[in-house]
Amino acid sequence: VKRQQRLILDTVLLGIIGALGARLFAFLLKETEILLLGRLAGYAPPGVMDGAAGGEVMGQHGLWLIPLVTTLGGLLSGMLVYGLSPEAEGHGTDTAVKAFHYASGVIRARVAPLKMVASALTIGSGGAAGQEGPTALISAGFGSVYASAGKRTDEERRLLVLMGMAAGLSAIFRSPIGTAIFAIEVLYSDMELDAAALLYTMVASVVAYAVNGLLVGWEPLFRVPPDIGAEFVDYFRYGALGIAAGIVAVFLPTVFYNLRDAFHSLPVPPHFKPALGGLGIGLIALALPQVLGGGYGWIQQAIDGRLTGFILLSLVFAKMIAFALTVGSGGSGGVFAPSLFVGAMLGGFAAHIFHQPAAGFVIVGMAAVFGGAARVPLATILMVTEMTGGYHLLGAAALTVMLSYMIQVALSESFRYRTLYEAQVPGRADSPAHHVEQLECAVHLLDTSRVCMPPTCTHLDLRALIASGIPVDLPDGKRLVIGMLKQKSSYVGKRVQQVFPPRKRERLEVVAVFRQGHTLLPHAGLLFQPDDRMMAVTTPGNWERLAEHFSPYTFDVGSRGGG
């Protein structure tokens, strides 16, 4: 109870810090955009920040200075990031997810402030990236540093990282429920959640939403018509949009990561690569200035039905390339806003084809493309409806996003890059964070079992031995082993106690079976399934004879980063 009370207090603190950090970053980004794009290039996109209404402004030089400014922004960002903290490059959400899975939630203290400045330079100079990645990393980074300063456990540090991520995103997108779910859904590429953390991410995101509302108001990010909704026949049109969005969602990660790989292979110092990406964006902007920045103002114009069909379709592809150039070259920014932009333009084009009002299709299109490409369908449905206030479209959004998600998963199976977030793992069973929990459970089982452990073997030693996959020699001449059941083994589908009867435990005794993140005791009804990990005590010769059924297995428990 005391631990839970402390964590609830942590959620309130992180909610407040997340909201303040998000507002500070938004202010810094706005001022940088005014300085670089506004004063140097003489250009202001419509709706600077937060999707507010406003018109496009061009100076006396038109668009011709934009390539110089985008190149300058990329150069400054690259010099800052690669000179001081390379992990601040790219889209920050992926860095936070990677820290959760592989680094015990450790994010270096310098990353958050560097990410804030580098992202402001990238996006403020016209880079086609969003606020979500930097905000997520800034607030998650504070949660990590706060946990390390308080000497919290690895488990609590990971939880505080998720709380921070939810809080920052809630403030920036004004979406308390969707972002709470996003923080626990974005960890996995399959339909899985870290549900145990939902209580804490929800409280943190609601606190951040409330603090942000107190500071800047309670209006949704985008304005939608009050009579927006969907009739029965519209669901067929939304179904078609879901199919198209799923196809686009397949290619979004592919274009992004292939361009990133191309930049990595260039024989150019990494400090200068974001400048090359910035030059590419600037050249695209000479023809389509709508690709600059996050593009919230242009999304609002699409909702209002003020863009032509040709422009809408052109921007689907132009923004995809522009955002890949920005973030793939090493620029600092998020992938959420560009993905929303692509989906919004696709939805607007669908409305143009179907001769329907644009607002509903733009909103649902935003959710469908990102929900499929990032494989976060549940969170995206809620986030987009909260960001727009379009709650009457919840059913249509659910249908469209789920269709997009299913098509994206099916079609991307043979692709190298299947999701926008490279650090995602398929499910809890694949996360080193949860492998640690399984190992701790295994050690506890050994403590309470009849296994004769070496007297000098501590819990830490035992965890390290089990994680390495090296058999542990026991004083009675037996070995503690871990193996993965092969998919074609004849043991698949048979009861564990049928294969290894308790009466023959002197030859092999099953201690536990690890399956999909859970630790199972070898009870009478437990059946072997492919890829089960079995921990057992056996004789050396007997284990060698079982090699046709079990392959060696090591638990990936990640690495601990520095503070």
Please report, for each region that a protein language model flagged, where it lies by residue.
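A structural signal for short secondary-structure junctions
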Residues: 362-363, 373-374, 475-477, 527-529
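Alpha-helical transmembrane segments and immediately membrane-proximal extracytoplasmic
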Residues: 1-443
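Cytosolic Rossmann-like ligand/nucleotide-binding regulatory domains
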Residues: 482, 486-546, 550
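Conserved NTP-handling cores and scaffolds of large molecular machines
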Residues: 214, 410-414, 503, 517, ...
